[in-house]
Each structure stands twice: as structure tokens, then as C-alpha cells.
Amino acid sequence: HIDFLEETIGHIPETISCRYNPGGVFELSNGIMDNPGDSKYGMTKDQLIEAFKILKDKGAKHFGVHAFLASNTVTNEYYPKLAGELFELIVELKEKTGCDIRFVNLSGGVGIPYTPDKEPNDIAVIGEGVHKKFDEILVPAGLGDVSIYTEMGRFMLGPYGCLVTKAIHEKHIYKEYIGVDACAANLMRPAIYGAYHHITVLGKENAPCDHVYDVTGSLCENCDKFAVDRMLPKIDIGDYLAIHDAGAHGFSMGYNYNGKLRSAEPVSYTHLRAHETRSNLV
């Protein structure tokens, strides 16, 4: 799509990054994490080499490489393994194209544990693993000045936001349903990915989880469910439910389909210290 880029913006930027897709499956010690070969994104290695040569001839001076091989991996192995693959790739790109490679973007994000039984990633261990690969691969190749970028939105924000919603309906047919006043317009992940988000019934944190519910929104789509066959305390109309780990991919992925209006976003914070005034010095 180099011609398309050139036609769209009128030139080739001096700094440009290309996305790599290694194909196949991406595996770690705990099994297959994702299947890049099925992804519509990125270039093969041969395409990437050719693209760098063409872009260089068209005036690009500084290059970056990006890859996204798995999403929300709750393991400290992902980033070091991804870094190793990309570092080896840019050494080869440098040798075969002579391009000035300035940065690498390790994508996919440091994952967060959406289920209570999982341990969180250790960011220090991840950093040490990436640093080790950097020293082993890039430094000996004369690429010790390459910058590393990454994407930490979910890691920084995900665990620190909740979607608070009110139980407004109940239905007893072939399953037990609790309808709430939020819907997929407020949090899409369960509807589009089948993703798990932990749910707490506020005020009933210590009550036995002895009821099986589907917790649903009000969209005219059967996938609009925050929980399916979830063991929860008995929920009464008017109870408030906290849907956890909604600080990322929440409001930003929201929409107005079905005439839905997105919720407010209150922020809770504490002043640790007031700013100083001149009177503090007197």
C-alpha cells in the first residue's frame, strides 16, 4: 500500500514504521497464545524487506518496525519473546536494506488478569527480559541506540475502572436473567469477544454465590450479556453491580446504536498534598 499512502498524503514521510506478521501460530510455554497467520494485518518478512527498499528510494530516512502477535497475555514471557523476534528481524533488515532503523514497537499490551484466580504480570520481570534480549541481539549488531516503544493503556487503566450498573429487571424462563441499566454500549468486550469481567453485587460481597444468572443489557442483540451462567449472590431489583476491570476498552469503544446514551465517567482521587503558597515559607 505504499502507492496508496503516497497518493493519500502526497509524499512519503521521512520517518515511517511498517508492521510485521510472522504467520503461523504464536506459542509460549503455556500453549498457543494467538494465530498471526489468520490476521489481516502486517507484512511477511520478504514484503517488509522490499517495502523498506522502496520507501528508502522514495525518500524515507528513518524506520521503525511493529508487531502484534497476541493480546492481553497474562504471562511475563510475551514481551521478551516478541522482543527477541523483532530484534533479530531488524538486524536482518539493517543488513539487507541499509535502512536507518530507529525504533521498534512491541505491541499487544501487557495483559491484566480479568479473572480473580490469575496473578498479574510483573512489569519489572518483563522489563528485565526485554533488556536481556536487547543486550544479546541489538547491542552486538551495532543497534544499541534503537528506541523501544510499547502500548500500556490496558495495563495502566484497565484495573482502575468499574462499570457500576443497577439491576432493573428479572426474568425467569429457561434461564435466570438479570437485566441492568448498562449495556454493550458502555462496555463492549463481553459482547464482541465473549470476554470475562468479574462482577460484584455491592453490599453482598460476603453473601454466598448460590444463584446462576445471565446478566444482560437492553440492546436488541442476544450477545449483549455481561455474564453468562455466572454464580452470583441473589440479586434483587435495585441492587448495584460493579463490573470490574472496565478502565480500558470501555467508554472509548462505546457507541449510540439502538439510541443508547453513554454513561458518565466520575473520577475518584485523593489530594495527598496541597500546592504550596508563599505563606508556607513564612
Task: Label every PLM stretch briefly.
Residues H1-F103, I112, K133:
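Active-site-proximal beta-alpha core segment in soluble small-molecule metabolic enzymes
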Residues E7-T8, F26-M33, N76-Y79, T115-E119, ...:
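Short acidic, glycine/serine/threonine-rich loops at helix termini
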Residues E14, C99-R102, N121, V125-E128, ...:
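Acidic/histidine-enriched ion/cofactor-binding microenvironments in catalytic or ligand-binding pockets
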Residues Y20-P22, H66-L69, G108, M152, ...:
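Short, structured patches in soluble enzyme cores that scaffold and shape functional sites
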Residues G24-L28, R102-K118, Y149-Y160, L187-M188, ...:
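Flexible glycine/acidic-rich beta-alpha junction loops that bind and position SAM and/or redox cofactors
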Residues T75-L82, P113-I126, L157-H169, V228-M231:
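Short glycine/threonine-rich loop-to-helix capping motif typified by GTGT followed
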Residues L138, L143-R273:
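Charged (often Lys/Glu-rich) extended helix/loop segments that serve as interaction or gating elements
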Residues H271-A274, R278-V282:
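Single conserved hydrophobic/aromatic residue that forms the stacking wall/gate
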